[in-house]
Amino acid sequence: MTVSPSSQTGRGEIGRDELVRWLGEYLRIGAYPDPSLNGLQIQGTDKIRRIAASVDTSLQTLQAAAESGADLLLVHHGLFWGRPLAITGPHYERVRTAIQADLNLYAAHIPLDAHPEVGNNAMIARALSLTDLQPFGDWQGHKIGVAGTLPRELGLQDFADRIQKLTGEICLVHGGGSPNIHRVGVTSGSGAGAIAEAAAMGLDTLLTGEPEHKYFHDSFEYGVNVIFAGHYETEVFGVRALAARIEDEFGIPWQFLNFPTGL
């Protein structure tokens, strides 16, 4: 694990319920048919003075958040995914750790992929300086990704190298399309299912996270390059940007807890 240095500018405080309301409105939590229980998943202290942010909710992450003195852990992947789950075994240990630390757990899954300002896909598009942005990446009738144009055309390997510099991880490249990259679609995490949509929009390349075997041939048959930059590594952007936005709004310091999975 690596822990980013705590931000030092914020010295604020906000009530838990006020922050939860603000997050719900800012992220449009109720706008998506997402079964993953977006919002406050575990209730803790009623005053928020420090935030930790992380991609996943593992026991290690919860322990690190508690040790950091955080009052709220902000995550992309929470503890609940649309089905009843007994509080036993590892799940019990996670819940117990949060409750014993009086730690709030707030999860934002699809709303944080899709958000136009601090979302994973919006932040990646900004980091790549994409222009002429368009909604992209259909998910149950909602566009949660983004498509855009590079400032200048790049070779496929040059573009993959640029992604590697951005994420710090070696990319897997399926070169099924043009060797020259100009129009790019971005869908973080498990977004390989957008290959056909990318082809229909005239995109030459899809940037996503996690490789899936069933989509290997689609890259070549639809004529679209696919760059897999890692599920984890493509989803660090949103929680960091959201935590920074909270600091800007309320003066609450934060730090990022980095537990990369290599996937």
Swiss-Prot record:
The keyword Metal-binding applies. One of its GO terms (molecular function) is metal ion binding. A divalent metal cation 2 binds at H77, H231, E235. A divalent metal cation 1 binds at H76, D113, E235. InterPro entries: DUF34/NIF3, DUF34/NIF3_sf. GO terms for cellular component: cytoplasm. Keywords: Metal-binding. Belongs to the GTP cyclohydrolase I type 2/NIF3 family. Homohexamer. NCBIfam families: YbgI_SA1388. This is GTP cyclohydrolase 1 type 2 homolog. It comes from Deinococcus radiodurans (strain ATCC 13939 / DSM 20539 / JCM 16871 / CCUG 27074 / LMG 4051 / NBRC 15346 / NCIMB 9279 / VKM B-1422 / R1).
